[in-house]
A protein has these predicted regions:
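Short, glycine- and small/hydrophobic-rich beta-strand elements in well-ordered beta-sheets
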Residues: 50-73, 77-79, 83
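Charged phosphate-binding loop/patch that engages nucleotide di/tri-phosphates or the phosphate backbone
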Residues: 116-129
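Acidic, Ala/Val/Gly-enriched low-complexity intrinsically disordered segments
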Residues: 3-5, 18
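Active-site-flanking beta-strand signature of metal-NTP-handling nucleotidyl enzymes
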Residues: 24-29
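An amphipathic, aromatic/His-enriched active-site/gating alpha helix that lines ligand/cofactor pockets
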Residues: 56, 78-118
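Short amphipathic alpha-helical segments
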Residues: 34-59
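Short, Lys/Arg-enriched N-terminal segments with co-localized hydrophobic residues
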Residues: 10-20
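A general secondary-structure signal for short beta-strands and their flanking turns/coil
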Residues: 21-23, 69
Length: 129
């Protein structure tokens, strides 16, 4: 998922701030020998992790797998006004950190990712409702 440099002690209030929806996509490689384990893990995501995802304004979240290349594509819709703060809030959660520690060995970050990224951000080039 997202790597945020540094730590934040408190979550900035979004009270009174206008919220918006933004479609987001990211991709990463999946180690060939970990495909089964990754699928097993995501068939039973921990409830605390799912709750934190919702709390941070992420909706309609899906992860797709492309085989035989073993590429993961994640899509979600962010409903909020400060994605960086919400991502940091998620990253500060001990249960989410434990989940990532289990999932990370399955993943192979793309060589072309930006510095500090685990999952590589993608540009939306087309959308049709």
């Amino acid at each position: 998922m997202m790597v945020i440099a540094g730590r934040i002690q408190t979550r900035p209030s979004t009270c009174g701030k206008e919220k918006f929806m933004k479609r987001m996509g990211m991709c990463i490689g999946l180690n060939a020998d970990m495909v089964g384990e990754y699928k097993r893990l995501h068939a039973a995501v921990w409830p605390e992790v799912l709750a934190r995802i919702q709390e941070c304004g992420i909706r309609n979240y899906s992860i797709f797998l492309r085989e035989p290349e073993n590429l993961l594509f994640a899509y979600w819709e962010y409903h909020g006004s400060n994605f960086a703060a919400d991502a940091a809030h998620m990253a500060a959660d001990p249960k989410t950190q434990a989940w990532w520690k289990i999932c990370d060995p399955c993943q192979q970050p793309l060589v072309s990712r930006k510095p500090g990224e685990w999952w590589a951000e993608m540009e939306e080039v087309f959308h049709c409702d």
